[in-house]
Amino acid sequence: MTANALFPLFANLHDRAVLVVGGGKVAERKTEALLKVGALPIIGAPSLTTSLQRWAETGRITWRQGTFEDSWLQEDIWLVIAATDQPEVNHAAARAAHAQRLFVNVVDDIALSNVQVPAVVERGPLRIAISSGGGAPMVARYLRQQLESLIDDSWGRLTTLFAQRRDTIRARYPNIEARRRFFETQLAGPLQRLLRKQRHAEAEAVLEAALAETPLTESGSVTLVGAGAGDAGLLTLNALRALNEADIILYDRLVSDTVLQMARRDAEQIEVGKSATGHSVRQEDIHTLMLQHAHAGQRVVRLKGGDPFVFGRGGEELEFLRTHGIPYEVIPGITAALACAAYAGIPLTHRDHAQSLCLITAHCQSSLDTLDWAALAQERQTLTFYMGVAGLPTIQQRLCEAGRAETTPFALIENGARAQQRVLTGTLKTLAHTAQTYAVRPPALLILGEVTALAEHLHWFGTAPLSAPCPPARIL
């Protein structure tokens, strides 16, 4: 049977009595929601949960101890919620409520209910209700979860900002069409972005200027965004929002097409990647592009693989932007060491094996020459080498010379956290040989330390780790 269509309605229950029949966990959740909106819950049940008992003792709720009685509805009740696990009690409460023309919700029973309690997303005064009409509540709950991740707290602050100036806005724009256009302009402007960055004073200034018809010109800005490593699912919610607000996206070579497809369709995408073997864009040219587009009033996203502040030259770019007076923000990402290790089943720290972690860049010989190899050769630490494929023979030689045991296990992770991921394992003695045997190519991350041996039985993503046979001994 198809349920009747429901009329969506928000009720003001502040200082109004609501009868909740039942004293279990479901009744507790309903009561907690009622308390949040200032209602006066009356709980009718033989016994209560610990929380309901505490609320009754502190006077937050009224308890009618016992089984449901029709007389409970003689107390100027506005709404009845039946939330027991006894169908006969729920039926009795519903019949009595219907007889007095009261709204009643019987949990998980459409036929006995004349109102449904929706799934709700709350952001301050902003409330979004989702209902399936009671027929498929899991659909409503699933959609609520999706909205929870998309709508951050700044929307609640924006709602409050507008509500505080409601009378001023209505007086300034008495015509409803003019008022609608004003709101549309402000919602598409910088207000919400400023509130998300906790810049409340600037947001208020923008709104006041708009009401005074002296709009403040929104300056361009640059957001450094970490795209994470490999799997597009590692992108953070803030990173996704930035991509959907961008006018220009300056992206690195290692950023996947899947991530770029999540960006706003109208955004211009410009590759500015660097490569050890192919075409590279100079850092000075990247600075120029950021400056040029920001000066044009555009929202620029500087999209980097991994995290902007882990071997991503993010610090240099912020110093440049600060010098030139360009507003900026930083959205961190999951760096390659964390992503690759997780997808290979390698805990970077472990109580029994490693108490410290080193992140090391090895993209050129000069980087390797400046390292303190004696410190890196110490045991009970995990080493992660970024951009080190070409330097693997040097890494092996210098660590062995510094005293790191040749039997120290390693994992070489190629295309980490991607569908093409390969994990190669061995010992320090076989490092260069293994990379050569399997023709390892960038992007690849080297993890060295006792924890890497755990990949053999903790791996969960892609194929099992591979290892090369030991190289033949040299004949002297």
Swiss-Prot record:
UniProt xrefs under Gene3D superfamilies: Cobalt-precorrin-4 Transmethylase, Domain 1, Methyltransferase, Cobalt-precorrin-4 Transmethylase, Domain 2, NAD(P)-binding Rossmann-like Domain, Sirohaem synthase, dimerisation domain, Siroheme synthase, domain 2
Keyword Ligase: no
Region (Precorrin-2 dehydrogenase /sirohydrochlorin ferrochelatase): 1-207
Superkingdom to which the source organism belongs: Bacteria
Keywords of this entry: Cobalamin biosynthesis, Lyase, Methyltransferase, Multifunctional enzyme, NAD, Oxidoreductase, Phosphoprotein, Porphyrin biosynthesis, S-adenosyl-L-methionine, Transferase
Residues that coordinate or bind NAD(+): K25, V26, P46, S47
InterPro entries referenced in this protein's UniProt entry, alphabetically: 4pyrrol_Mease (IPR000878), 4pyrrol_Methylase_sf (IPR035996), 4pyrrole_Mease_sub1 (IPR014777), 4pyrrole_Mease_sub2 (IPR014776), CobA/CysG_C (IPR006366), NAD(P)-bd_dom_sf (IPR036291), Siro_Cobalamin_biosynth (IPR050161), Sirohaem_synt_dimer_dom_sf (IPR037115)
Catalytic residues (UniProt): D252 (proton acceptor), K274 (proton donor)
An individual GO BP term: cobalamin biosynthetic process
Record has NAD as a keyword: yes
UniProt modified residues of type Phosphoserine: S132
Region Uroporphyrinogen-III C-methyltransferase, residue ranges: 220-476
Entry GO MF terms: NAD binding; precorrin-2 dehydrogenase activity; sirohydrochlorin ferrochelatase activity; uroporphyrin-III C-methyltransferase activity
One Pfam assignment: TP_methylase
EC number: 2.1.1.107, 1.3.1.76, 4.99.1.4
Binding site for S-adenosyl-L-methionine: G305, G306, D307, V310, T335, A336, M387, G416
Pathway recorded for this protein: Cofactor biosynthesis; adenosylcobalamin biosynthesis; precorrin-2 from uroporphyrinogen III: step 1/1; Cofactor biosynthesis; adenosylcobalamin biosynthesis; sirohydrochlorin from precorrin-2: step 1/1; Porphyrin-containing compound metabolism; siroheme biosynthesis; precorrin-2 from uroporphyrinogen III: step 1/1; Porphyrin-containing compound metabolism; siroheme biosynthesis; siroheme from sirohydrochlorin: step 1/1
Catalyzed reactions: uroporphyrinogen III + 2 S-adenosyl-L-methionine = precorrin-2 + 2 S-adenosyl-L-homocysteine + H(+); precorrin-2 + NAD(+) = sirohydrochlorin + NADH + 2 H(+); siroheme + 2 H(+) = sirohydrochlorin + Fe(2+)
NCBIfam families tied to this protein: cobA_cysG_Cterm, cysG_Nterm, PRK06136.1, PRK10637.1
Functional summary from the UniProt entry: Then it catalyzes the NAD-dependent ring dehydrogenation of precorrin-2 to yield sirohydrochlorin. Finally, it catalyzes the ferrochelation of sirohydrochlorin to yield siroheme.
Entry similarity comment: In the N-terminal section; belongs to the precorrin-2 dehydrogenase / sirohydrochlorin ferrochelatase family.
Name of the featured protein: Siroheme synthase
